[in-house]
Amino acid sequence: MSAYCGKYKDELIKNAAYIGTPGKGILAADESTGTIGKRFASINVENVEENRRSLRELLFCTPGALQYLSGVILFEETLYQKTKDGKPFVDVLKEGGVLPGIKVDKGTIEVAGTEKETTTQGHDDLGKRCAKYYEAGARFAKWRAVLKIGPNEPSQLAIDLNAQGLARYAIICQENGLVPIVEPEILVDGPHDIDRCAYVSEVVLAACYKALNEHHVLLEGTLLKPNMVTPGSDAKKVSPEVIAEYTVRTLQRTVPAAVPAIVFLSGGQSEEEATLNLNAMNKLSTKKPWSLSFSFGRALQQSTLKAWSGKAENIEKARAAFLTRCKANSEATLGTYKGDAVLGEGASESLHVKDYKY
């Protein structure tokens, strides 16, 4: 049997290509209730549904922002929420030319017999949930696998379990009309150098595409969401140009040309760092058969959150900060960002959280 060719085939290909449109990218607004609670705590905002809804309305209804986005990843709660005027967020996004997406994994669990390595859960009722989300207007999905670099990590067991888990998720999504974002995140935690990150990234991505192939996943109807290839959080930093070179080389060696787009996670980089690194990749004149874009959460929202601080009177200021980051990242997907965005408070601070849980 070859790749998936069921009733959603053409729609999957069209939607995946659209999300990868140069000049556009993805806002990851799918933080779990617990994670958004930590963000709110940092700005002294209570973690209740109305505040979560207000933040999402602030983002999705920022005038001019949606032109820079092709997709927004939602948490299940947000998929069914509305603006204060009663308009479903899904409709707001669609009218702005943005595809709604949905986080479908149910978090990580430890793999017994390993050094606290993890695999991701959520396969059991996944088909049923995907069908329900498609019905509600979602057109793509996200599933995060997490690997770490250590003296003996990632183990072959963790690599294989996570690759197989991602592939199972991907084919179930496609059978239910959702474009799967395949996210094998290799955490930045640790003192390793960029060569070690590049090597591990190659091994992990090769395993993922082998598994996707074995599960007959239609690659043209998928997206990859990898980490950038960088030194560990406790190692000496390198320039965006070096990160770009290592990252693109790693992708050239592992990601088939059939994949329409690669949308990077920011992995705790500061807002400005993530944008500069993406820009450097798009400036590289080398073979890139896929578009290189963003799927940023913290790196699109940090200065916006700080400007807002949960106060209605700060909404305009917060929206200006959000628009600035959306525009900067849009330019970075074209390799035209000049590093001239007005930096809001928090735009250049590291957003790294050790052993980050989404």
From Swiss-Prot:
One of its GO terms (biological process) is glycolytic process. Expressed in callus. Pathway: Carbohydrate degradation; glycolysis; D-glyceraldehyde 3-phosphate and glycerone phosphate from D-glucose: step 4/4. Coiled coil: none annotated. It is an enzyme of class 4 (lyase). It catalyses: beta-D-fructose 1,6-bisphosphate = D-glyceraldehyde 3-phosphate + dihydroxyacetone phosphate. Its main location: cytoplasm. Substrate binds at residues 39, 266-268, 298. InterPro entries: Aldolase_I_AS, Aldolase_TIM, FBA_I. Induction: By gravity stress. Induced by gibberellin. The active site is at residues 183, 225. GO terms for molecular function: fructose-bisphosphate aldolase activity. Keywords: Cytoplasm, Glycolysis, Lyase, Schiff base, Stress response. Its EC number is 4.1.2.13. It comes from the Eukaryota. The keyword Lyase applies. GO terms for cellular component: cytoplasm; cytosol. It is found in: Cytoplasm, Cytosol. Belongs to the class I fructose-bisphosphate aldolase family. Homotetramer. Plants silencing FBA1 display reduced root length. Fructose-bisphosphate aldolase that plays a key role in glycolysis and gluconeogenesis. Involved in gibberellin-mediated root growth. May be regulated by CDPK13. Associates with vacuolar proton ATPase (V-ATPase) and may regulate the V-ATPase-mediated control of root cell elongation. PANTHER family: FRUCTOSE-BISPHOSPHATE ALDOLASE (PTHR11627). This is Fructose-bisphosphate aldolase 1, cytoplasmic. The lineage of its organism: Eukaryota, Viridiplantae, Streptophyta, Embryophyta, Tracheophyta.
